[in-house]
């Protein structure tokens, strides 16, 4: 069987719930019900693993440098095998080793997808200011007016949380709907309704108190391309969340190609163990790791002397997040 065929089988829908691989890492798989894999126990294991990877990894680097200085270099094959092991462990720890008990039940992050899927798909209509207002108006038209009027909303024009009854949502719904063609408004309401049904309660109501849709225009171009491939839904969002996994794998492959396994292990362990960007904060997302992939690509392409491609990758990463520009 070819690699392409294996990937096709792995990503084939399972009971209309998305890629088959996601069933393996979902709470529906009885494997994850074992006591050592439950959240409290697993989080303790992850903390220990992160500390061990960083401390032991640092010790091994110093040991190798010391051995080389003494004229007793570590065998290349052994160093490579240890580096591969640390790369695998570092990569896995970022994803909590795909244990569903420590993250979002269906892998993808609904709060994230509400903002970036809807925001990019309907950017022409909602722009940077109208996502929350249009969401509330859609809910009113879907028959939930009494409930909507009781909520608060962040007014993105002034960055203040206000009662919905004091905003344009109730006073002038056309402030939003005038930007939509009828078929696009119907599609928007359908997508909003899916989010409401899948994330009802305080979780849903608090989404419109966040800080709105905020990616730069370059990200919006890519996000809109993928978002318009399907309606809001469990299976489709799992496919979109898969993009970041592929970007992670691609970045690791580039590091191996350009720098070898030892440098790759250092980079992957650092990325996998840093608390500021752990999976709970950045995982299960929609194209959140694109800037990182292109930044890594720029460094690797520079190492291999593909300067034009490296410049393009660094430019794209900078357009996505601005701060990679410090590497120019």
Q: Which stretches of residues belong to each language-model region?
A:
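N-terminal secretory/membrane targeting signals
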Residues: 1-14
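Multi-pass membrane glycosyltransferase architecture that uses lipid-linked
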Residues: 9, 18-328
């Amino acid at each position: 069987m070819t690699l392409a065929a294996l990937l096709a089988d792995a990503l084939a829908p399972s009971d209309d719930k998305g890629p088959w691989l996601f069933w393996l890492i979902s709470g529906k798989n009885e494997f994850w019900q074992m006591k050592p894999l439950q959240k409290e126990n697993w989080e303790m294991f992850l903390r220990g693993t992160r500390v061990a990877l960083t401390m032991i990894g640092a010790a091994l680097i110093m040991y190798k440098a010391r051995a080389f200085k003494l004229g007793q270099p570590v065998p290349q094959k052994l160093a490579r095998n240890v580096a591969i092991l640390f790369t695998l462990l570092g990569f896995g720890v970022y994803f909590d080793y795909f244990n569903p008990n420590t993250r979002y039940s269906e892998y993808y992050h609904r709060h994230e997808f509400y903002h970036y899927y809807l925001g990019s798909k309907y950017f022409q209509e909602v722009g940077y200011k109208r996502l929350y207002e249009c969401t509330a108006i859609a809910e009113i038209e879907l028959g939930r007016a009494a409930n909507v009027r009781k909520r608060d909303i962040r007014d993105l024009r002034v960055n203040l949380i206000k009662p919905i009854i004091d905003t344009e949502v109730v006073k002038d719904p056309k402030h939003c709907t005038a930007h939509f063609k009828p078929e696009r408004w119907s599609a928007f309401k359908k997508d909003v309704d899916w989010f409401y049904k899948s994330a009802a309660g305080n979780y849903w109501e608090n989404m419109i108190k966040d800080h709105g849709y905020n990616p730069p225009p370059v990200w919006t171009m890519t996000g809109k391309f993928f978002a318009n491939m399907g309606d809001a839904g469990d299976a489709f969002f799992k496919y979109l969340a898969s993009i970041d996994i592929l970007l992670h794998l691609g970045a690791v492959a580039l590091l191996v190609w350009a720098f070898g396994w030892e440098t790759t292990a250092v980079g992957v362990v650092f990325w996998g163990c840093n608390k500021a960007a752990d999976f709970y904060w950045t995982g299960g997302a929609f194209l959140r790791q694109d800037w990182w992939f292109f930044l890594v690509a720029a460094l690797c392409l520079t190492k291999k002397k593909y300067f034009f491609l490296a410049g393009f990758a660094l430019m794209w990463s900078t357009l996505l997040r601005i701060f990679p520009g410090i590497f120019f």
